[in-house]
Regions:
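Internal alpha/beta core interface subdomains
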Residues: 101-177
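Short coil/turn connectors at secondary-structure junctions
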Residues: 1-2, 24, 55-58, 80-84, ...
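Short, solvent-exposed amphipathic alpha-helical segments in soluble enzyme
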Residues: 18-24, 74-80, 103, 138-139, ...
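N-terminal basic/disordered segments at the start of proteins
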Residues: 1-33
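N-terminal beta-loop-helix "entrance" segment that forms/cooperates
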Residues: 28-51
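Gly/Ser/Thr-rich loops at beta-strand to alpha-helix junctions
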Residues: 5-14, 62-70, 79, 91-94, ...
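Hydrophobic/aromatic-rich, well-ordered segments within soluble, folded domains that form packed cores
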Residues: 49-53, 58-87
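General beta-strand structural signal in soluble alpha/beta enzymes
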Residues: 27-31, 60-63, 87-88, 121-125, ...
Length: 177
């Protein structure tokens, strides 16, 4: 997973450097001047996202959630294609899954980063909170290729609201005729 750690304050940079131990392939970017060669200087978060949004699989914003959301808004398209996004407070107490929790992997990333910091992961997707299957990950889990379905969100809503839900699977696994 190609991960960008976006740090806007000195405390955020310090936290990003700690995260490099758990995520050695991550790239730290910051608008703050810094002598550490591991930190890539950027002119602004807005400009960085405009040029790099499609080149990263995941973004971890360290700082205010509002900055994270406002910075991302112009680039968002669809939960099936948007990258994973998490947000951390600069003290490293909480790691919140913000965008593409299941399909993009933000929930898993939030848990992984929280574990590395001894922080609390904040996961708000209904299936995770209720400890239910993630229907949108079911096909990936089993190596299936799902057909595009505009109704998937409606099915997920029925499922997490404990309504009768049927999944029709046309699957040919190894060993089946």
């Amino acid at each position: 997973m190609k991960l960008a750690l976006i740090a806007g304050t000195d405390a955020a940079i310090a936290l990003a450097l700690r995260l490099l131990e758990a995520e050695p392939g991550a790239v730290i970017v910051s608008t703050r001047p810094h002598a550490d060669p591991r930190i890539r200087p950027i002119s602004s978060i807005k400009a960085f996202l405009a040029e790099s949004f499609a080149t990263f699989d995941a973004f971890a914003f360290i700082g205010a959630l509002g900055i994270c959301v406002r910075s991302l808004a112009p680039h968002l398209a669809d939960k099936r294609t948007d990258p994973a996004v998490v947000n951390l407070d600069e003290a490293g107490r909480h790691v919140q899954s913000v965008l593409s929790g299941h399909l993009g992997g933000a929930n898993a990333l939030a848990r992984r980063l929280a574990h590395a910091l001894g922080a609390e992961p904040v996961i708000t997707t209904a299936s995770d909170v209720q400890e239910l299957w993630s229907l949108d990950l079911l096909a990936r889990t089993h190596g299936w290729t799902p057909a595009a379905s505009p109704d998937l969100n409606a099915v997920i809503a029925r499922f997490v609201n404990r309504r009768p839900t049927a999944l029709l699977l046309e699957v040919r696994d190894r060993g089946t005729a």
